[in-house]
Amino acid sequence: MLTILHASDLQFGKPFRPRAGEAFRNLAFDVMPHLIVVSGDLTQRAKPREFKAAWDFLQRLPTVPLVVTPGNHDVPLYRIWERAVTPFWRWRHHIPRDVDSVVRVAGSMIVGLNSASPYRAIVNGRIQRHQLTFARKAFDETPPGGPRVLVVHHHFVSPPDGEGGAPLPGGRKILQKIEDMQVDVVLTGHIHQTFIASSRDVIPGDRAGVPLIHTGTTTSRRGRGPEHRKNSCNIVKVLEDTIEVTPHFFESRGSAFEPGEMVSVPRPGTPMKTAYPGTFPQED
């Protein structure tokens, strides 16, 4: 079994909610996962003090392997020269992780890909061919039966309410390659809503597709849709035949991340028994 604590869209800067940050830290120590994933947007405006605060925060979490990927907010928006010439300089200076990265944990292979695309998009992203080659080579080294996890910031499928902007361009072709790599689960953020989709939403088939697990904003005031004024993160457990996802929500007046309803989906390649659940149940 592989247990992952999945956060996203911390957005250190003006939107950051310190109480949510402290609640997430407490949850991390309660869970003590094998791995912590932060799928992009560590900062709000890619400023040095925001990157420093984000990394200081991550260093206060349990000392387990950490996967972080850039999001569109982690490249300069208004500093045009910097965006054009050295868009990831501040990331590389303050975050000691490559923008594309590989982490091995207890027989599992976790690959983080940078979907932020400062030259071609402001909000949306891109995944390039060389990045897919990078991921394939890493996954080819996975021990037999070991979980394969892919982390990107941008989403491949829109949430049920249609909010969140357009999915990644070329998503169908990318998801086909992800299926070919035998990836077990994709973890994303960006749209500030928690829900589960599947590569089967894009690519037809009679076997279970790759689960696409989205978490909302974990520590900012920018929750959207049903997560307005809420924060969220997921506990993801990769088991032999299934993947269990338990969303956790932090209310604006709360003091802790509280668990929602656990959802179990089949690992890719197994017979499909039920449709994917979409958004998680929300309590008012």
Residue ranges and their predicted role:
Residues 139, 143-159:
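Short acidic, glycine-rich surface-loop motifs adjacent to enzyme active sites
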Residues 52-134, 142, 177-179, 206, ...:
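Extended active-site neighborhood of metal-dependent phosphoesterases/phosphodiesterases
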Residues 13-15, 44-49, 53, 72-83, ...:
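Active-site environment of divalent metal-dependent phosphoester hydrolases
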Residues 1-60, 78, 134, 141:
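N-terminal active-site segment of His-dependent metallophosphoesterases
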Residues 1-5, 102-112, 143-147, 207-211, ...:
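Beta-strand-turn-beta hairpins that frame and shape the catalytic cleft
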Residues 7-8, 36-41, 65-72, 114, ...:
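Active-site neighborhood of phospho(di)ester-bond hydrolases with catalytic His/Asp-centered motifs
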Residues 163-239:
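Conserved beta-sheet core of the metallophosphoesterase superfamily
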Residues 237-284:
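A short C-terminal boundary segment appended to hydrolase-like catalytic domains
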